[in-house]
From Swiss-Prot:
It is found in: Endomembrane system. Residues 90-105, 350-362 have a biased composition (Acidic residues). The lineage of its organism: Eukaryota, Metazoa, Chordata, Craniata, Vertebrata. The modification N6-methyllysine is found at K230. It is a peripheral membrane protein. It comes from Homo sapiens. This is Cell death regulator Aven. Residues 37-47, 61-72 have a biased composition (Gly residues). The gene is AVEN.
Amino acid sequence: MQAERGARGGRGRRPGRGRPGGDRHSERPGAAAAVARGGGGGGGGDGGGRRGRGRGRGFRGARGGRGGGGAPRGSRREPGGWGAGASAPVEDDSDAETYGEENDEQGNYSKRKIVSNWDRYQDIEKEVNNESGESQRGTDFSVLLSSAGDSFSQFRFAEEKEWDSEASCPKQNSAFYVDSELLVRALQELPLCLRLNVAAELVQGTVPLEVPQVKPKRTDDGKGLGMQLKGPLGPGGRGPIFELKSVAAGCPVLLGKDNPSPGPSRDSQKPTSPLQSAGDHLEEELDLLLNLDAPIKEGDNILPDQTSQDLKSKEDGEVVQEEEVCAKPSVTEEKNMEPEQPSTSKNVTEEELEDWLDSMIS
């Protein structure tokens, strides 16, 4: 059937579709061209025209006409023309076979059912719920996080997991476990004297409302010594040695006015409480004495007349000041000591001054 179908289609299908004239119109031009170009080729052209399809038949006839220029050539080309005409049904057979195979495949194809694998996921969820208890999904986000696990659970070594399993509770290691909050509360309940480690008598239970004001003591006695040193000096800006001696030795006269006589001997210098309080000021006065321009050795060059006059003028001024403050017995004692002062001034030596300085420094 396939061979008959191919033969019918080769002659009748394409010429009717391409040209309305059919085979008669196509054979005549092919035969005329073959006669004009060559006799031997005419038969080949005719055969090619009959076996061709559509427009290709005229071209095959022309090709056969060209080849038919001589008898030997036409005889050689003739089998080629027949072979070309017979190749068309072979092509049709292959097309028909492929079409039939496609029809068979379509007929035998059946749709495959899609099997859902949701059951195995449900089984896993049921197992998890049975192990951890009933929990609704989506109700609490913390439940989902706990089921997923921490970020460290996926990246821990086996040794770390063993450490977690071996870790003991804080109750077992009670000696190393300290609750800081309870410790702070216990310390706050203790009294203040125990917390500060101080005697209970030194800690005041209540805070005083008014704090007593403390006024510092002002020592005006030292200022008197400084003012006395800044008094009138001798000629040339240098005071006599006995004047300096009397200033330092006459401290009891200025501070404690019970003994107004400035005696140069060591027996007359008795320590009193004002002297101890003015110890710091004495050091300052000693620095002033050492910084004076006149050295101690120049005291020998001073004339006795000048020293006696200066002593008398100074003693007169001291007597005037003491008369206003002191009683009459003190004035009589000064008059008794006046004749002794010039004699003692002459007996002042460098050794006594050095001893006096040493006593002041010590």
